[in-house]
Amino acid sequence: MNAQELRDKTPDELRDQLAALKKEAFNLRFQQATGQLENTARMRSVRRDVARVATILTEKAAAAAATE
């Protein structure tokens, strides 16, 4: 997912996506701890996606506060 696609989404959609990504990250950590994780690179990409979504949410909140 790229940042431009995320900027086109509403804050509610971004919050939903952030929750889903955090849940996936939790499941991946659990799989790694039990030795079931096959694609370890997925953990890195999910962690970066979480950061990307959180950054866009912060940008949108700052923009909304600036217009008020």
UniProtKB/Swiss-Prot annotation:
- Which keywords describe this protein according to UniProt? Ribonucleoprotein, Ribosomal protein
Q: Out of the domains of life, which is the source? A: Bacteria
Leader sequence segment? none
Q: List the InterPro entries.
A: Ribosomal_protein_uL29, Ribosomal_uL29, Ribosomal_uL29_CS, Ribosomal_uL29_sf
The record's Pfam families line, in alphabetical order, gives: Ribosomal_L29 (PF00831)
Output one GO BP term: translation
Gene Ontology CC: cytosolic large ribosomal subunit
PANTHER family reported for this sequence:
60S RIBOSOMAL PROTEIN L35/50S RIBOSOMAL PROTEIN L29, LARGE RIBOSOMAL SUBUNIT PROTEIN UL29C
* Similarity section: Belongs to the universal ribosomal protein uL29 family.
Which NCBIfam families does the record match to this protein? L29
Its protein name is Large ribosomal subunit protein uL29
Give the organism the record lists: Dinoroseobacter shibae (strain DSM 16493 / NCIMB 14021 / DFL 12)
